[in-house]
């Protein structure tokens, strides 16, 4: 299919996903280059005309977070100066989403700052997947299309027979109950909740306090929006195994997997971790316990629907 007035550009963070999205749409990626000067300054060059086009930029603000964010801002500036008709940013993983409120005195709300920066740069629309906090949509005065990874994850477990009353979907904390309930609805399973307390002094650490729900003799599926150092999800998995779960699977949309994450996962009770490709994982980080499924078709369909001014609501259903 040809979209003569649409362009899709990839920046540095997830070119592999961008290529899959372009292939699903039947188009070629736009031609551009990104380079850094010796002092770290970023320069972007657009190597084809985009005058009058609706331009989509695909870039996750994963590690290195600040470089990837600056690439977007610089690219948007270049596109505006080159007379793009409309600029939409496809940010599968929205970095700084964990800083969505003041948890303590004198803290910034960096998620809002990032929203301000994108708008001031000239972004007309944002397409993202599973924000850490859904209220971040309200930080923007431009349209925000918030896709969900749960239908894709549900499709995977459905294909592997992990459905029904013998399976329990588990939220690793109270904040993820809505996400767990959605997956449980797709799979027609009960849910359970891990009651945990996060350390106020140490980042990325938490202690399992209690399991709310029956997991004994059940296959458990943990679901979270992101896994960073994997401490929380692995502690939860081990607690479920100790409580009598016959098997523990885990899933997340965003595989940040920083620091000791891979070692933690390897040593944990998790049998298989299912992740999406919102963040690029090189082959050496795809250990045997990790299986990655692609959001390319979902993102491609969303881009097409946005461009053609059609609703995105059908994309929130299992099997689409």
UniProtKB/Swiss-Prot annotation:
ATP binds at residues 39-41, 98-99. Binds 2 Mg(2+) ions per subunit. It holds the Pfam family Pribosyltran_N. Keywords: ATP-binding, Cytoplasm, Kinase, Magnesium, Metal-binding, Nucleotide biosynthesis, Nucleotide-binding, Transferase. GO terms for cellular component: cytoplasm; ribose phosphate diphosphokinase complex. Pathway: Metabolic intermediate biosynthesis; 5-phospho-alpha-D-ribose 1-diphosphate biosynthesis; 5-phospho-alpha-D-ribose 1-diphosphate from D-ribose 5-phosphate (route I): step 1/1. D-ribose 5-phosphate binds at residues 198, 224, 228-232. Gene3D superfamilies: 3.40.50.2020. GO terms for molecular function: ATP binding; kinase activity; magnesium ion binding; ribose phosphate diphosphokinase activity. Homohexamer. This is Ribose-phosphate pyrophosphokinase 1. The lineage of its organism: Bacteria, Bacillati, Bacillota, Bacilli, Lactobacillales.
